[in-house]
């Protein structure tokens, strides 16, 4: 047929059914061989792609001959397809390896960036350690990097990075190898690419070659955080990797990692890790308020992780420990807060009490203790004030009793907590004993023992 569209359809049908109907596919070989000499480069390229995509060992030699011929084709489109056909030739017959390497040398001598991009991709798959093939062409590949296909660029960057690490001396603050400088300059020019894979590859290359200059390309990675969630997640994972390597300071870009309401859970959790571990002391206060907002997320996983992150932030920056403690106490008073998040918040408060003064700890403990039973809560609530949420879950009740036992002797308003609240609390516990879980009962007995010991020693 003279119709290009009909020919495309025929090529697709042959590729689709070649494995299930090999005899019929073999009958079409002569047609493909004639098309390899067609004046139209599109037809020549499609014929070569179809011939190499049949994957029949009977035609392995024909495919090899077609690739050899196409490697000298006047049109770069055909030469690029010939380059991508090399792995197929190797899979059909491993004995063609040396011949394929010779073909690859021909492609590296090409002047077309599209062919060079295909050649580097095939090099990575076919002979990734044959550095002798690249020695003469290293700078040419660096200069052609910007003109390659955006999907060939990441592979080419990987190949050039591996070559540099294996064959070029490591840079220092005073000396950078000229070849490496050429590569770094070419890489820097790709940070404006609209393809996220290219930008990520640039950052990875700098991290491997010259991490001291990462700060120059890191803003391009931050720009990708405005991309769809799957791309943003990859960006955050790379930011975490760089954060652990300590080669770049992420704190100036902290707000870019703030969690959005539309972020899926997996992305929000990764962002929370970056926020907690990259915040500076001057940013900790604002971040604490931001994390407190996340605790009200509709996603339980994000809310739980936000509560934990608030505690981690307080542990990393002592200056915001008291603020974080107060924010967590406020979080526990939210009426709509889910029980798992409430339990986690009480547990984190329990772990942070040692960071504040005894008087502050006493106030926090009393506020939680009054929320164990309705009579105690009503005793301090104004008639017009909203109802106080009672801590009904087992984990929270055990944590409050533990905190109260730890601070029995702490004074508040001239009296110890043992005198202020413990007797009334124990009476309520006894009245509701049969309704309490075993862990709460055990902690209540421990509290009673701690309360009895100082009293008994006083009367001795």
Predicted regions and their residues:
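Residue-level signature of the C-terminal ends
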Residues: 17-21, 54-57, 89-93, 126-130, ...
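Short inter-helical turns and helix N-cap capping residues of alpha-solenoid HEAT/ARM repeat scaffolds
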Residues: 2-3, 39-40, 74-76, 111-112, ...
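Solenoidal tandem-repeat scaffolds enriched in leucines and small polar residues
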Residues: 70-198
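Conserved small/polar residues in nucleotide/adenosyl-binding loops
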Residues: 458-459
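Buried hydrophobic core positions in alpha-solenoid tandem helical repeats
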Residues: 31-33, 66-68, 103-105, 140-142, ...
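Residue-level signature of alpha-solenoid helical repeat scaffolds
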Residues: 11-16, 45-53, 83-88, 117-124, ...
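Core helices of alpha-solenoid repeat scaffolds
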Residues: 25-29, 59-64, 94-101, 130-139, ...
